[in-house]
Amino acid sequence: MALALVLNSGSSSIKFQLVNPENSAIDEPYVSGLVEQIGEPNGRIVLKVEGEKYTLETPIADHSEGLNLAFDLMDQHNCGPSQLEITAVGHRVVHGGILFSAPELITDEIVEMIRDLIPLAPLHNPANVDGIDVARKILPDVPHVAVFDTGFFHSLPPAAALYAINKDVAAEHGIRRYGFHGTSHEFVSKRVVEILEKPTEEINTITFHLGNGASMAAVQGGRAVDTSMGMTPLAGLVMGTRSGDIDPGIVFHLSRTAGMSIDEIDNLLNKKSGVKGLSGVNDFRELREMIDNNDQDAWSAYNIYIHQLRRYLGSYMVALGRVDTIVFTAGVGENAQFVREDALAGLEMYGIEIDPERNALPNDGPRLISTDASQVKVFVIPTNEELAIARYAVKFA
């Protein structure tokens, strides 16, 4: 069985999957796992093989040791690189800047180009590079492929991609809208076309990727024409811990009146804002319980969250001119029926009508949740970024 190894390297963790690229979107990966608490004494590796779960607790010094230990654990359970045919390795890379519009076969030169983009993604790209370096040493004889979160949004028209600031400053410092979650938005927008069995160029779609991080995209005939995240993943929708769109003047105000440093404001907006900053929680199951108990902070957080979804929805309906499908995906988008219902409430005049019974069904693969009379077909489609990355990677094998 030919498999692709998919790696998602974070600052203190590595998520990995062994994926059969021929799988359907809802098939479980053959192997999945997580290396966590890298650099800490309480490191842990969790491995899941065809439904069975195995755990190794040990200090993990760095990404190299973490990935080697993960492979050793896989070998112990007959699913490691020495027993299986790994044909390619796909690496999720958060930021490709303006340099990368499509997946790239990784070479030393490509690694240096990704490293040069670290100023655009200082929280993500360094860890992505670490994962690439380690994996190339451990598996030197298979192609390694970088798949960029930003790649899908290279098609944005200038009016959507550029900010109204001094053009020379913007050009010098790479300031523009890049967009993120691109692999997910592309995956579900392609999937809905397959479900409808229509030519890609005939379908206009609005995609909601709603997880702890959240973004939306307007996709016209298979090409992204707008998206809610910007130069960084901080922009756009209200998220679990991120503020989303705010008046930029707030940054100056906090600096001048509260004496906060840039790093403190960065931490506030990225980690202490959003739904959690407003309500104290960022898990929508907890938020729903609080709302049911009439917690006013939870109500306020939820209303602000929904308001921002609807603002972007209206904007993208205008940008597309004609909307054929709407797709919800990711943790909240796939599982929180009340979010879907409230995001699309009262839009029957625009041809959008949710079927309450369909919307209430459990998350079990792609499904239609709009009424038969709805002009706009609304779907819940589970995203599978790892499968998408695996399929890209094996093309280079």
From Swiss-Prot:
- The intrachain disulfides are none
Q: How does it assemble?
A: Homodimer.
Quote the SUPFAM superfamilies the UniProt record gives.
Actin-like ATPase domain (SSF53067)
**Site described as Transition state stabilizer, positions?**
H181, R242
Q: Which residues does UniProt mark as catalytic?
A: D149
- UniProt entry keywords in alphabetical sequence: ATP-binding, Cytoplasm, Kinase, Magnesium, Metal-binding, Nucleotide-binding, Transferase
Q: Which GO terms describe its molecular function?
A: acetate kinase activity; ATP binding; magnesium ion binding
One family from Pfam that matches here is Acetate_kinase
InterPro entries, alphabetized = Ac/propionate_kinase, Aliphatic_acid_kin_short-chain, Aliphatic_acid_kinase_CS, ATPase_NBD
Which residues of the sequence carry a binding annotation for substrate?
A: R92
Residues annotated as binding ATP: K15, H209, L210, G211, N212, G213, D283, F284, R285, G331, V332, G333, E334, N335
Subcellular localization, per the record? Cytoplasm
What does the note under cofactor report?
Mg(2+). Can also accept Mn(2+).
Top-rank taxon, per record: Bacteria
Q: What EC numbers are recorded for this enzyme?
A: 2.7.2.1
Protein name (Swiss-Prot/TrEMBL): Acetate kinase
What does the record give as its pathway?
Answer: Metabolic intermediate biosynthesis; acetyl-CoA biosynthesis; acetyl-CoA from acetate: step 1/2
GO CC aspect terms? cytoplasm
What the entry lists under PROSITE patterns is as follows:
ACETATE_KINASE_1, ACETATE_KINASE_2
